[in-house]
């Protein structure tokens, strides 16, 4: 029996729909009365773990799950040792730099030297500004990062943006995009290489749903 790590939040519904297309039913996770964090498919072919998105690659890397679905942003932030198998083409968003609309900055390179940037994606933010050779202080925030520039604690933020509505409602504007992010299918490398629990069979079924393989 294979174990699949599914992410709580925005990607869950589409993830469950995807697996249902290949005969694995985890819709019980969508029941508002559900409190279980681990369930088995009715055919007893596979089980799924319901975990925080950031924890999906951890369960996969350590072999507690053979497959998982996670945003590309999490993979870049956490850099886990997992096999990135396919772009699932849902959950599209982007990692962006945003500043107050009234600020004079319209590009990352215009930010002041040693300026402050608030983000929950510390690694992604540090890597981005290092590549630009711009010295900034990254302030880790794990709640509403929009409050960083609103309160004057930071000059900018680095955060995921989908529609941009939250930014607009808080008087912020995007000035640069670090990368685009979508949901990805990941696997435990050794399990995938050895085809444990007929893992290849499930991956191939998923790939037949016109998924884009990752180079």
Curated annotation (Swiss-Prot):
Keyword Oxidoreductase: no
Gene Ontology, cellular component aspect: cytoplasm
Pathway: Amino-acid biosynthesis; L-histidine biosynthesis; L-histidine from 5-phospho-alpha-D-ribose 1-diphosphate: step 1/9
UniProt cross-references to CDD domains, sorted A to Z: PBP2_HisGs
Main location: cytoplasm
Catalytic activity: 1-(5-phospho-beta-D-ribosyl)-ATP + diphosphate = 5-phospho-alpha-D-ribose 1-diphosphate + ATP
UniProt-recorded name of the protein: ATP phosphoribosyltransferase
